[in-house]
Amino acid sequence: GSWQMTDALRLDAGYSTIDGEIDAMTVRPYVAGNDVPNAPEFTANLALTWDQNIGDLNLMARIEYAYQGDVFYHVVQGNDLDSPNGGVPGLGIAPNYSVPAALQNLTGEGGLDTSYENTKVDAYGITNLRVSLGGDQWTVTAFARNLFDEEYVGEVIMAPEFGGAFVTPGTYRTAGVEFQWNF
């Protein structure tokens, strides 16, 4: 929702929750009751915007915070069995798979373990900032995305049957200036 606090100041907020659970799975019956992968239990966002005309110019500043709860990236979670058949026959892959150490570095404490037992990535929050000054035909904007350079995992595609995972780190801090001309 939104709340117009004053003529120039607005607060926006949002919250969503998903209570997803795996009912049944033929190839891995032991995962029934686990969380649906790739779906955090909740997300939330908060933004404060100050938008003020100063003479013929418009000055706008906006700070945003977005939070994502813990998320599992595989149907196998916690102390579930590591594989339905004790490994992949003929490939010499043992039942206990190794998750790349890079996942620990990206998530810090409590992120993905070096064991296939834990396929959860910790919650994280990102702060963005924008400040714009504009006239009738132009706008100059300075911005910072992921202002505090939060390290987080953006996506994990688990492939334990093949000995690991494909990991995409979250977006690092980026900052810049944009110029817009309307003609």
Locations of regions flagged by a protein language model:
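Flexible, solvent-exposed coil segments and beta strand-coil junctions
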Residues: 22-30, 105-112, 154-159
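Extracellular loop and loop/strand-boundary signature of outer-membrane beta-barrel proteins
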Residues: 27-36, 114-118, 162-167
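Generic secondary-structure boundary/loop-capping signal
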Residues: 19, 33, 51, 121-123, ...
